[in-house]
Regions:
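Flexible glycine-/small-residue-rich
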Residues: 31, 60, 109-112, 164, ...
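Residues in the short beta-alpha loop(s) of Rossmann-like NAD(P)-binding domains
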Residues: 62-64, 203, 235
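Short, glycine-rich, amphipathic interfacial segments at transmembrane boundaries or analogous
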Residues: 231-241
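Walker A/P-loop NTP-binding active-site region of P-loop NTPases
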Residues: 26-91, 137
Length: 243
């Protein structure tokens, strides 16, 4: 995997146990197209942060279609979910699931309700504010597209990982998401510094690029014009690992 290091030395972020007064960072993992690898990226990114000593929570925003718990291997441990917290039916600590393999990693599963409007701006904001008191990083695993869950996932973001496949349709949809981040995120509405955007290119196959069946890294960079954080090669190992 080719990668560019995300800035983990920012003074606004502390490692777990650091006594200095600093605030958490909210990172959304998003895209305009489904099936590009957002949830796998969310799980891997959150795990990487936790292994580096940052207390990290990853939240599934895909209401009605949750699968972060499956990827994280905790599907049988879900008792309460994100919507339960928002509706005051459970506390954050009742809903959070501690990862069995990493002490600094916690998961909040999405609700299986069919009500796509179950997430509210005030409710999500309240939960994010509470989590900021305890965590170094809050990773928001967004559903695809621009439905309510996706908008809520990006609204409070400080940084964004935009996951795209090297296909024209995927890149075009990612460009639309970048437009929403720059105009509809809370930072944009409040006149603050814009959300810091990074690109993750997934399912990259150099042979198909050479044959003209896929866009090259440079092609994608020319279109989206944001820094490339990492390139994940197309591999059957990813599918096997998730199963």
């Amino acid at each position: 995997m080719k990668r560019k290091n995300i800035d983990l030395s920012n003074q606004n972020v502390k490692k777990s146990g650091d006594k200095m007064s600093k605030s958490a960072k909210v990172v959304v993992v998003t895209s305009g197209k489904g099936g590009v690898g957002k949830t796998t990226t969310s799980a891997s990114f959150a795990t990487g942060l936790a292994l580096r000593g940052f207390k990290t929570v990853v939240i599934d925003f895909d209401i009605g279609l949750r699968n972060l718990d499956l990827i994280m291997g905790c599907e049988r441990r879900v008792v309460y979910d994100f919507v339960n917290i928002i509706n005051n039916e459970a506390t954050i600590h009742q809903a959070m699931i501690k990862d069995k393999n990493c002490d600094n990693l916690f998961i909040i599963a999405a609700s299986q309700t069919k009500d796509k409007n179950a997430l509210t701006e005030d409710g999500v904001g309240r939960v994010i504010s509470e989590l900021k008191k305890e965590f170094d990083y809050i990773v928001c695993d967004s559903p695809a597209g621009i439905e309510t869950g996706a908008f809520m996932a990006l609204f409070y973001a400080d940084e964004a990982l935009v996951v795209t496949n090297p296909e024209v349709s995927s890149v075009r949809d990612s460009d639309r998401i970048l437009g929403i981040l720059s105009s509809k995120a809370k930072r944009a509405l409040d006149g603050q510094e814009k959300v810091k955007e990074h690109m993750v290119i997934s399912r990259y196959n150099p042979e198909r690029v050479e044959s003209g069946d896929m866009l090259s890294i440079d092609d994608i960079k020319d279109i989206l014009r944001i820094p490339v954080l990492g390139v994940i090669p197309e591999s059957k190992d990813v599918l096997q690992a998730s199963n």
